[in-house]
């Protein structure tokens, strides 16, 4: 993507990359003239060649955030479909969407774009060292504490301090009543 911020690392110099910390760093250093900010997992090509144009149009027409796909197709090492999931944004727009997925609420992450003015009230996102950062971010976007059973099981093994730090994030932005959309098309998780 032209003029995008690329943060390169190497195994020799860096032992750990923590996505949420990098997102916070990138957002903190965004140019003041930028209107939109996107983050995309590096292993997600999109079937919709116009995903960027469509996403910007959705933001310009009133969405605060846009998930950059409506369905994710997970591929194994031989590029054979292992399973599929609807995107979280599509699932939240239509709770009757039928799909089979490991996540009852749909895929929470993968790729998002938002208006910088809105994101100023959302960032910094929590540094989630226990994993599943996309899930916690989505809980915040939708202002819900309806934590899935697998996430609750994962959370329960940590101290109350860690639990509280994660649970306060949905509280921080839940009264924003964000207008969240999705971009048409599939992405492929390589």
Indicate residue ranges for each PLM-predicted region.
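Active-site-proximal specificity loops/subdomain of glycosyltransferases
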Residues: 2-34
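Structural signal for conserved beta-strand scaffold positions within catalytic alpha/beta enzyme cores
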Residues: 7-9, 67, 181-182, 189
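Short, solvent-exposed loop/turn segments at secondary-structure junctions
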Residues: 11-13, 43-45, 71-74, 119, ...
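Short beta-strand-to-loop acidic/aromatic patch adjacent to the donor-nucleotide binding site
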Residues: 34-45
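Short, Asp-centered acidic motifs that coordinate Mg2+ and/or phosphate
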Residues: 36, 64-65, 180
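Residues that flank catalytic or metal-binding motifs in active/ligand-binding sites
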Residues: 40, 108-110, 184
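Conserved catalytic core of nucleotide-sugar-dependent glycosyltransferases
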Residues: 47-143, 158, 163
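C-terminal catalytic/acceptor-binding lobe
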Residues: 128-190
């Amino acid at each position: 993507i032209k003029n995008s911020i690329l943060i390169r690392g190497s195994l020799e110099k860096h032992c750990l990359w923590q996505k949420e910390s990098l997102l916070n760093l990138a957002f903190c250093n965004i140019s003041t003239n930028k209107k939109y900010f996107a983050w995309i997992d590096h292993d997600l090509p999109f079937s919709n060649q116009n995903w960027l144009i469509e996403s910007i149009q959705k933001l310009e027409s009133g969405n605060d955030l846009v998930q950059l796909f409506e369905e994710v197709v997970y591929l194994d090492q031989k590029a054979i479909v292992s399973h599929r999931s609807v995107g979280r944004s599509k699932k939240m727009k239509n709770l009757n969407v039928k799909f089979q997925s490991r996540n009852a609420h749909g895929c929470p992450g993968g790729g998002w774009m938002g208006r910088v003015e809105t994101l100023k009230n959302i960032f910094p996102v929590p540094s989630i060292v226990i994993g599943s950062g996309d899930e916690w971010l989505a809980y915040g976007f939708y202002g819900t504490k309806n934590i899935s059973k697998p996430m609750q099981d994962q959370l329960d093994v940590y101290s109350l301090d860690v639990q509280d730090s994660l649970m306060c994030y949905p509280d921080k932005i839940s009264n924003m009543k964000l207008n969240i959309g999705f971009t048409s098309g599939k992405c492929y998780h390589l």
